[in-house]
């Protein structure tokens, strides 16, 4: 649940004590559980997978990548038969409360099967498991847990500048002058319209 929807008291407590995970209550539990693990201890959780990718969880990812070592079964949607639809997408992960230099985690991608049994069978087959160096995620802006990328992509992120450092982004898919370029259908004079042209040349000839 979004912490902002849980009332002023909870929202205030979370903002004060869990700055890095305040985007959602489940991510607060991720951070809180980390505080309860002894150094070198292990902990397993099943949570929504949004913390792996979204910007609002970037600080939490950064903390986890620098303090924990992680292995994962990325479950995706329909991991539990009791929960239908694509809305709830989950991941199961085990983390060790210690940072290991050059640690390679195992990540099983189980997002494609649409049933609980299908995901279990795919996991046991071992055909969709990746071994990824956790430190490589740091090379990607925003630090998403993109475990399926090959080494060449991580090298490109390390060597090449990002687009944001090279160009200025502005509004996309906009005419910048709607009064000049856009017309509502009722504004067009039917006598000047052509509905039989099959290409641009035909439309031009009909003028």
Named regions from a protein language model:
Residues 1-197:
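Signature of N6-adenine DNA methyltransferases within the class I
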Residues 193-207:
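C-terminal target-recognition/interaction regions appended to catalytic cores
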